């Protein structure tokens, strides 16, 4: 009987606790901008002109709550100032990477001379610097190799920013890169699509959405489609960070940081506005105003060195004629803390304040914390180096193959190794200081290995160990030989 009651209770609970599955829910989220629009916005931030930023945000919808998109109440306008931090970040990152790039050399003397001529004529390292900045700002780009006997007898290397190219993929592999070149003829805009694929280059001219003959404008009259060996493509993409938003495209370092840059500009603009509003004001009774010694007229105030506000002279019997100066109190510490917080959010995950020359004593309390923050610069630098180390050998190889194809010579693979010098960061200096201590419980070989790791080859490290031992007076003696054969004969 008792078991039947228990079973009945269980059945009642089961029916009571039935859980219905949730109905499928669909969400629709609209992107604010496409890739080209986002690239344009990032370019304006990089240019760093407050007038251009103000115009840009007046045209972007749903940005009324942002600092640059807001419109002040009439009579309460504030001067919007831009710190220029985005441009400083990009230029600094590009500089600390490319300044350590070692020269590319080949074992073949003829190739070495040819590459030096190509580098000199194309100003290649300047182009690489510009390309790196554009890839950081826009997200990606591509190098294009072409030939024009009227300009040069060598390959012409050009870089196109990400907003001027399309990258087409086939099963996760790059199929072709389309370069967009704009021409304006008789106030009409034409766009040339140069499609660079494996073994071919094709040209199409568009006016709006309509395809036009190539002879429609003089700039494209002599262009013809070409085919060559299908083993290579005369275009090489340059992507530093992969985009999570646009599949197959690069990601700008500004993506996800625009709101932080906007807040930093707001903090700085408010601070400057408070300083301007907090100027000392001098109130002078009319009877004490400075006058011309000849005419007796009141001298007109000078905005540079003689500013004052005129007040009526007191008429009471015991009036005290005096000049009053008032200085409003500006909460400087509050503005500093706001500015530091906004600055920290802007640099987070990108670069260390000390790399930019910013005094971060108010951000970091000790040297150890500063060295840890400096590692952020190393992570970003290593990501840029990795992308250059992947792109540059491909570009050099394709350049030589394209040149041989143009000369109707057989093509061959060209392999190079891209190397960079060491970045003198506080972390490395701390390692040197620690390992140079003679009381460190490590052998010389272990210290050299810990200090240089994979950045130096085994031969270099063995030679370094030998030099250190010689300098410290450590002598390595050969193992004494024992003439066992003579001893056995005796």
Give residue spans per PLM region.
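Glycine- and charge-rich intrinsically disordered segments
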Residues: 1, 5, 11, 266-272, ...
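Extended, helix-rich architectural segments
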Residues: 1-159, 164-168, 172, 488-490
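Surface-exposed loop-to-helix/strand elements on domain peripheries
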Residues: 107-108, 292-293, 312-430, 466-474
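Short amphipathic alpha-helical segments
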Residues: 110-114, 120-128, 135, 256, ...
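Short coil/turn segments at secondary-structure boundaries
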Residues: 130-132, 147, 276-284, 356-362, ...
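Extended, regular secondary-structure scaffolds
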Residues: 130-132, 136-138, 142-251
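Extended, charged amphipathic alpha-helical segments
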Residues: 224-369
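Activation/maturation switch segments at domain boundaries
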Residues: 261, 437-490
